[in-house]
Amino acid sequence: MDKRAMLGAIGLAFGLMAWPFGASAKEKSMVWNEQWKTPSFVSGSLLKGEDAPEELVYRYLDQEKNTFQLGGQARERLSLIGKQTDELGHTVMRFEQRYRGIPVYGAVLVAHVNDGELSSLSGTLIPNLDKRTLKTEAAISIQQAEMIAKQDVADAVTKERPAAEEGKPTRLVIYPDGETPRLAYEVNVRFLTPVPGNWIYMIDAADGKVLNKWNQMDEAKPGGGQPVAGTSTVGVGRGVLGDQKYINTTYSSYYGYYYLQDNTRGSGIFTYDGRNRTVLPGSLWADVDNQFFASYDAAAVDAHYYAGVVYDYYKNVHGRLSYDGSNAAIRSTVHYGRGYNNAFWNGSQMVYGDGDGQTFLPFSGGIDVVGHELTHAVTDYTAGLVYQNESGAINEAMSDIFGTLVEFYANRNPDWEIGEDIYTPGIAGDALRSMSDPAKYGDPDHYSKRYTGTQDNGGVHTNSGIINKAAYLLSQGGVHYGVSVTGIGRDKMGKIFYRALVYYLTPTSNFSQLRAACVQAAADLYGSTSQEVNSVKQAFNAVGVY
């Protein structure tokens, strides 16, 4: 069994270099995308003015048209898709590149404006689309594209026609297929049986060819499930590892049951019984006496309790209200399938298998596993990292990082291992992955050792070890490959990676862009000449990411 694939880019394969930018190299810096010959991260005093924040972005891009090569006025090439004010008072905007009204897949630009000054741009835009022979009318229909994707799933993934669920609507995009952008359909095929999947297909709109495909289990959409009316109460039960926990429940006098429904956090935390079937969400967990000590209860106790801990961590440490930032309800189903050796975020809720008792215990028994999977939901609502190649490895690393930080926050025998509480119960000291020593379980701890094949969506669970090691070194310090890193502690490390994830990364960010994002996040939080900034640079140097 491949441990690395248990917890669950685009072929842009970015190579990046840092260069001084503009007349004042001391004030401005840039990470350069070698493939597209355009910037992917620019920071410094870029442009000042009294215009609306988005107008500053348009003006700057127009002034630097020879650098960004958009081929026209920026306001005609970019669509503002998000605007917010962060905790530092910065106006943070997300723009999506368009070509004749059609979205360019993965081409998202994040801009920061502070006190009337444009201070950073993050994200890769595809240049000179007007100079290419790009079609904007499809030769095949949406229905044909969807049939092609579903048939490929049946042929290559499930070996039978899956029972498809509603996924994201199919849409036309300009897809950067290597160095040749093409008009394509983005098709989402989502299913639970015979095995769970959430596949993204890029189908050539001219001839129906499959340009790319990957399993992105973590695409988000609003969840379902109905709460019960009743009185908030506190129950008690025993978790997977035998520890006692107090849990928030709801008593319904109408039904005469206590339900695993926590009304004290956001829009609620709900835990369901899958009854060893593969239908979601199952039944809202009910109990007659508010005491959950049966062995069958254990997985539900942990799923419910740990979901509350994750909610509290993001709220109390980062000021984030649930995974979407707007207090979305958190729903979990336990006892999914029979002996199912995995856990996943299916786009609307958490799903936990019971494990087979030998390789895995019930997955909800690992607090870092719960934190890991719910962080995928946070990523979906922020950077939206494509679950393939380096962007996918960053996606996985973010979940490992914050799953571990949740474990330390709860102070439940915390360590830098992933999944150690529920993996191979008969083997002491074993885990799925290690942040402190990725090589312990066969994962790379330096960019020179990265996996470059196509398995595991391009090594998302493998190459995450490189970023995990950088995060560990940033927190704890140490010497790695001859590079000395001064540790700044877990709290500051978490703040930096959170800010990079939420306010700087884009769907196709790679490791070099992550480095630039973390450097900028540290500068925002602690100052550009701070030890924290130096430590970020040291940590990424130590793992060979520049």
Curated annotation (Swiss-Prot):
Cellular compartments per GO CC: extracellular region
Thermal dependence of catalysis: Thermostable.
Binding site for Ca(2+) 3: N413, D415, E420
InterPro entries for this protein: FTP_domain, PepSY, Peptidase_M4, Peptidase_M4/M1_CTD_sf, Peptidase_M4_C_domain, Peptidase_M4_domain, Zinc_Metalloprotease_M4
Active-site annotation: E373, H461
Record: residues binding Zn(2+): H372, H376, E396
Gene Ontology molecular functions: metal ion binding; metalloendopeptidase activity
Keywords: Calcium, Hydrolase, Metal-binding, Metalloprotease, Protease, Secreted, Signal, Zinc, Zymogen
Entry cofactors: Ca(2+); Zn(2+)
Purpose: Extracellular zinc metalloprotease. Has collagenase activity.
Propiece residues: 26-228
Compartments, as annotated in UniProt: Secreted
PANTHER family, per the entry: BACILLOLYSIN, NEUTRAL PROTEASE B
Catalytic activity: Preferential cleavage: Xaa-|-Leu > Xaa-|-Phe
Organism: Bacillus sp. (strain EA1)
Positions of Ca(2+) 2 binding: D368, D415, E417, E420
Positions of Ca(2+) 1 binding: D287, D289, Q291
Key word Signal present: yes
Main location group: secreted
The protein's name in its UniProt record: Thermolysin
Comment on bound cofactor: Binds 4 Ca(2+) ions per subunit.
Top enzyme category: hydrolase
Segment forming the signal sequence: 1-25
Cross-referenced Pfam families: FTP, PepSY, Peptidase_M4, Peptidase_M4_C
Lineage: Bacteria, Bacillati, Bacillota, Bacilli, Bacillales
Family designation: Belongs to the peptidase M4 family.
EC numbers on record: 3.4.24.27
